[in-house]
Amino acid sequence: MPEPPRDIMAEACEATRPSEDEDEEREPLLPRVAWAQPRRGAPGSAVRLQADQGAAVLREPATEEPPVVSEDRSISASLSTELDRTRNAVSETNTFLEDPEFADVVLKAEQAIEIGVFPERISQGSSGSYFVKDSKRTIIGVFKPKSEEPYGQLNPKWTKYVHKVCCPCCFGRGCLLPNQGYLSEAGAYLVDTKLQLGIVPKTKVVWLVSETFNYSAIDRAKSRGKKYALEKVPKVGRKFHRIGLPPKIGSFQLFVKDYKEAEYWLRRFEAEPLPENIRKQFQSQFERLVILDYIIRNTDRGNDNWLVKYDEMKYAKKIESEESNWIDDKQLLIRIAAIDNGLAFPFKHPDEWRAYPFHWAWLPQAKVPFSEETRNLILPFISDMNFVQDLCEDLYELFKTDKGFDRAAFESQMSVMRGQILNLTQALRDGKSPMQLAQMPCVIVECSKSGGQGRVVHLGSSFTQTVHCRKPFFSSW
């Protein structure tokens, strides 16, 4: 029998001591006493219950065979048990008690990974993002790990590596905090929910582990070594805190079906103009996209990363049944999905090389003033500074979960967002268009140190408004 490698044995002897240089990607481990116990009613218990039942058969006396378990079967059962414990620890962090539907989707993703249906890397984009599937191989979500973001160390796309090596002076976006894209994705959904826009697919922060994710060679070697030690020397292998690859934290966004890139539909609409009612619906959805992007100051909004769903067949059937060119305004036949929100929430306005403009500002829809429907929906929210403060506090609760969270940097992010909200409020009151909104001077609204500590906030006494005059080298306006 081959001997285990010396480095694996050395790691096993020190497994009881906590590591001082754990990768920030790794899941915060639970105490062994806590995660060694079977969970009750937690996501993933159904699948792991079946695995436990399969292992229990080995311990029960059979009618045709003696109740003696072979060494190989004992090792296999031990390995399966340790892997289940690791999976339980991962699933413990993916509990969404306030949203059972989302928890069920994440559970399906975990179950699929356990049976070998792994997430599939998306070829498009500049980061490592993955289509997550259920056990039937149906796409149910998009997972974007923190470590594989455009400027992350484990980004599998070579384009950003070439960018970093060949043009380091222009590498990255100087106005954004590095490796915070997964929080930006979840934060965009939070803003969308608070403002009742309804254009961002549900997005939350989750932990997932899969062989198809991009791991370092060291992590993969450790995983193989621990499995080898557990298989050959079970007593030693059981001392490891985790068996298998380390979980990755990232944003999980529900997959939207029957949507196409906006670029496709915009060309179609130029050649085949929409009916008046459908045009109004599209304009309303477009204005919501503008409001979202402007508030979070999205630095990466092109016509290829927002989606449109237009149910032409349903509209045709409606026309045939009513023999009219008029349909119910309340029935939305065209919708917009705002995806790819990972490069938002800057801590300052872009003022270095590029301006990162909103590409929707050059569309014909951007020249139309904001509708009364949009003004009535948004103004009651953003004109109330108590609502704005609540929004900042909700974002704080989300962003502070990151290990590299910095309170001062977060306050700078909120100062930019408050300035954007202030401009948007003025534009809606003045009846401006999205294009005119994008041309307004950049404003920063900083929280005054002498402001009150209560929940009721007054703009004049608690905040200081500053106009940001510095423009980037390549300016859009």
UniProtKB/Swiss-Prot annotation:
Looking at its record, which EC class is this enzyme? transferase
Q: Where is this region: Catalytic loop?
A: 297-305
Instruction: Name the domain of life.
Output: Eukaryota
Region of interest: Activation loop: 338-358
Ranges where the PI3K/PI4K catalytic domain occurs: 116-447
- Entry's EC annotation: 2.7.1.67
Looking at the record, which segments are called G-loop?
122-128
**Sites bearing Phosphoserine, chain numbering:** S45
InterPro entries referenced in this protein's UniProt entry, alphabetically: Lsb6/PI4K2 (IPR039756), PI3/4_kinase_cat_dom (IPR000403)
Q: Which residues bind ATP?
A: S129, K144, Q253, L254, F255, V256, R267, R268, D340
Where are the stretches annotated Disordered? 1-80
What family is it from?
Answer: Belongs to the PI3/PI4-kinase family. Type II PI4K subfamily.
Biological function:
Together with PI4K2A and the type III PI4Ks (PIK4CA and PIK4CB) it contributes to the overall PI4-kinase activity of the cell. This contribution may be especially significant in plasma membrane, endosomal and Golgi compartments. The phosphorylation of phosphatidylinositol (PI) to PI4P is the first committed step in the generation of phosphatidylinositol 4,5-bisphosphate (PIP2), a precursor of the second messenger inositol 1,4,5-trisphosphate (InsP3). Contributes to the production of InsP3 in stimulated cells and is likely to be involved in the regulation of vesicular trafficking.
Q: What is the name attached to this protein's record? A: Phosphatidylinositol 4-kinase type 2-beta
Traced from the root, the source organism's taxonomic lineage reads: Eukaryota, Metazoa, Chordata, Craniata, Vertebrata
Gene name per UniProt: Pi4k2b
